[in-house]
């Protein structure tokens, strides 16, 4: 049986996500993947420059000292920190840790994740700069 009735199709604009702050923040958080791709490509080029000798490495370091590249890398760092913050806030929701018959709140888990991140960063910087 066929019908001539047209089904209702709710109109949806391409800017639907701009209406609520939750969706805007979600799109910003998902957009942190773009700077991550930039950093990955930059890291791969750095590895190839390191492999190709001192002249290639010096050229790569000169590239990194370009003010535009420094600004892009600072934006990438900010995006990585935002992504890390949101990921650390999500982790306690996935973990069900019970101590003495009581579920642990999200604060200790988030603080411990940040502590591990800070310690790992300090160790990596120490090894890179002083080893």
Curated annotation (Swiss-Prot):
GO terms for molecular function: succinate dehydrogenase activity. It is found in: Cell inner membrane. InterPro entries: Fumarate_red_C, SQR/QFR_C/D. CDD domains: QFR_TypeD_subunitC (cd00546). Keywords: Cell inner membrane, Cell membrane, Membrane, Transmembrane, Transmembrane helix. Its main location: membrane. Disulfide bonds: none annotated. The chain crosses the membrane at residues 30-50, 63-83, 109-129. One of its GO terms (cellular component) is plasma membrane. It is a multi-pass membrane protein. Pfam families: Fumarate_red_C. Belongs to the FrdC family. Two distinct, membrane-bound, FAD-containing enzymes are responsible for the catalysis of fumarate and succinate interconversion; fumarate reductase is used in anaerobic growth, and succinate dehydrogenase is used in aerobic growth. Anchors the catalytic components of the fumarate reductase complex to the cell inner membrane, binds quinones. Part of an enzyme complex containing four subunits: a flavoprotein (FrdA), an iron-sulfur protein (FrdB), and two hydrophobic anchor proteins (FrdC and FrdD). This is Fumarate reductase subunit C. It comes from Shigella dysenteriae serotype 1 (strain Sd197). The gene is frdC.
